[in-house]
A protein has these predicted regions:
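Dual-mode signal for accessory low-complexity, basic/Gly-rich regions
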Residues: 162-341
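Active-site bordering "gate/hinge" segments
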Residues: 1-194, 203-206, 293, 327-341
Length: 341
């Protein structure tokens, strides 16, 4: 158990009433509606939550902490009845003053939407695929599931026998850090009252750690790294905190400029991922890359590959931002299959 509970600055005393929250949502929506090409709003929202958590365990631990969260989001509509497009922007922070300005969220949602108008179909091909950060984090989510102690104990992960093996190229580092000040996934102790420390899941491309709680560590016969998470009525199970792929050494613009013929993914649909075999197939939308530049919008394609190969070929940009509890920079994966027309 933990002896000294760290202060991670996870609670903002600032309070918004319902009218102020409504005004924030309206401001966000109005800024989206001002952008040329937007035909309607798909809704805007703002929220505030305050949580007080206290844990007492049978082995003598008793401690607690408070968390706050503020968020705003907006979704806009553009195009016509024959080809209607929608997209969004969103921000979430522990402290209200750190939240992105409403005008910026609305404007970004609108610009994202307008840029998708008049999409084209593309032919089936092998192509380099660039994942925008808002969808590249889904790859990190798959990694999180693959290294979760429950998956390893059950044998339902293709990484279960790969500890200390090379999974990625040597530039890839994947970290879980519960101690980030004002972090959306930060916790001063895990949900079994144990001390939590930062650790590398992937270090220089090599698999170094599972995500474990007490139960899964005992099942696997190794030391726990204290990642227990639970609800009010559920048993603890391992879960990441602030998990992220470290920034690489190349910019997003450099990655795109080096691609003659590729696909930039901004949207993913469906759940066609098999964590036992690694087979990966998901519906996608985004933009064609031609001669090193973002070209026209593309929709209704499927991107496919195998996670084992995708991890091995993964290249990361230097644009990591912490917007969620799982965060990733722009990711390039060469030679994926794109199923189009």
């Amino acid at each position: 158990t933990i002896e000294t509970i760290p202060n991670l600055d996870l609670f903002d005393t600032y309070d918004l009433n319902s009218d102020e929250l409504k005004d924030l949502a309206l401001e966000t929506e109005n800024s989206a509606l001002k952008v040329k090409g937007v035909t309607n709003s798909n809704g805007a929202s703002s929220s505030q939550s305050k949580t007080s958590f206290h844990l007492s365990t049978s082995n003598g631990f008793s401690g607690g902490y408070k968390k706050s969260n503020f968020s705003i989001s907006c979704s806009a509509i553009a195009g016509n009845e024959l080809s209607m497009q929608t997209d969004y922007d969103y921000d979430s922070k522990v402290f209200f003053k750190d939240l992105k300005d409403t005008s910026l969220v609305g404007k970004q949602a609108a610009e994202n939407t307008v840029s998708k108008c008049n999409p084209k179909k593309i032919k089936t091909c092998k192509s380099d695929v660039v994942f925008d950060p808002r969808v590249s984090r889904t790859l990190l989510s798959h990694i999180s599931s693959l290294v979760n102690g429950v998956s390893i104990a059950r044998g339902s992960s293709f990484l279960s026998e790969k500890m200390n093996s090379k999974i990625f190229n040597k530039e890839i580092n994947i970290i879980d850090n519960p101690n980030i000040v004002k972090g959306l996934g930060s916790k001063p102790f895990d949900d079994e009252g144990c001390e939590m420390k930062r650790f590398n899941i992937i270090e220089n491309g090599i698999l170094k750690s599972w995500i474990l709680d007490t139960t899964t560590s005992q099942q696997l016969g190794i030391k726990s790294n204290s990642r227990a998470s639970r609800g009010m009525s559920s048993s603890p199970s391992p879960s990441p905190t602030n998990m992220f792929i470290e920034s690489g050494s190349i910019s997003k613009d450099e990655i795109i400029s080096n691609i003659k013929d590729g696909f930039y993914v901004t949207d993913l649909i469906g759940q066609g991922v098999n964590l036992i075999t690694g087979d990966y197939s998901r519906g996608a939308g985004g933009f064609k890359i031609e001669n090193g530049k973002i070209s026209f919008p593309v929709n209704e394609v499927t991107i496919a590959g195998n996670l084992k190969d995708m991890f091995n070929r993964m290249i990361v940009a230097n644009d990591l931002e912490f917007k969620y509890s799982l965060n990733s920079p722009t990711i390039l994966i060469e030679g994926m299959t794109i199923a189009g027309i």
